[in-house]
């Protein structure tokens, strides 16, 4: 149990048996009437977001979430297999839980897996990863880094926009939150 005054981003709440993550929160003290807390919550399993308002100071149920360092090993059918870095226990995680993180994971990628009562909830990636371009149209002579972008496919199969001068085999840094090209890696 926690008070609504203790809400912060990333906190997992248990509301009516469903797990929700606090994405945004704002304490509001109007001139008239009692204070309240306005929140934006994201459903842990479905990813759906809702706006919910709580009266200030009331108690809400929090869920115990254990975040563990894990390593992505391989894909087994539709499932992704992760290994706990501390005790080498392996977890099979479904594609609905991995979500968009699959676009940036290569074998042996270090990630954080959030567990609730031993069940995986979601996968957190580092903010950026280095991936190799496996396909892109050839650049034209005279292409400059500021001349525009073109589509490129990286080794995970994900497609990003890169500057025109980049070629197949180039390693690039990609932001895992937005999927944007951040720079070339030597």
UniProtKB/Swiss-Prot annotation:
Subcellular localization(s) per the UniProt record: Cytoplasm
Keyword Cytoplasm attached: yes
One BP term from GO: peptide biosynthetic process
InterPro entries attached to this UniProt entry: Elong-fact-P_C (IPR015365), NA-bd_OB-fold (IPR012340), Rib_uL2_dom2 (IPR014722), Transl_elong_fac_P/YeiP (IPR020599), Transl_elong_KOW-like (IPR013185), Transl_elong_P/YeiP_cen (IPR001059), Transl_elong_P/YeiP_CS (IPR013852), Transl_elongation_fac_P (IPR011768)
Functional pathway: Protein biosynthesis; polypeptide chain elongation
Residue stretches in coiled coil: none
GO CC terms: cytoplasm
Single GO MF descriptor: translation elongation factor activity
Top-rank taxon: Bacteria
Matching PROSITE patterns: EFP (PS01275)
Keywords assigned: Cytoplasm, Elongation factor, Protein biosynthesis
Function: Involved in peptide bond synthesis. Stimulates efficient translation and peptide-bond synthesis on native or reconstituted 70S ribosomes in vitro. Probably functions indirectly by altering the affinity of the ribosome for aminoacyl-tRNA, thus increasing their reactivity as acceptors for peptidyl transferase.
Family from the record: Belongs to the elongation factor P family.
UniProt-recorded name of the protein: Elongation factor P
Protein source organism: Beutenbergia cavernae (strain ATCC BAA-8 / DSM 12333 / CCUG 43141 / JCM 11478 / NBRC 16432 / NCIMB 13614 / HKI 0122)
């Amino acid at each position: 149990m926690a008070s609504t005054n203790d809400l912060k981003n990333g906190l997992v709440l248990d509301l009516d048996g469903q797990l929700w993550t606090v994405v945004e929160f704002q304490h509001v003290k109007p001139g008239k009437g009692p204070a309240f807390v306005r929140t934006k919550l994201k459903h842990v399993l479905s990813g759906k977001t809702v706006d919910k308002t709580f009266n200030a100071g009331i108690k809400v149920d929090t869920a115990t979430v254990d975040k563990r360092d894990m390593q992505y090993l391989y894909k087994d059918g539709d499932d992704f297999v992760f290994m706990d870095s501390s005790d080498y226990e392996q977890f099979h995680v479904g594609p609905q839980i991995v979500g968009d993180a699959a676009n940036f994971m290569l074998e042996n990628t270090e990630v954080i897996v959030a567990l609730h009562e031993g069940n995986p909830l979601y996968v957190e990636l580092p903010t950026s990863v280095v991936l190799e371009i496996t396909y892109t149209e050839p650049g034209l002579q005279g292409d400059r880094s500021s001349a525009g972008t073109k589509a490129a496919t990286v080794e995970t199969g994900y497609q990003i926009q890169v500057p025109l001068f980049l070629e197949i085999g180039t390693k690039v840094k990609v932001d895992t939150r937005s999927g944007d090209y951040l720079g070339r890696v030597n």
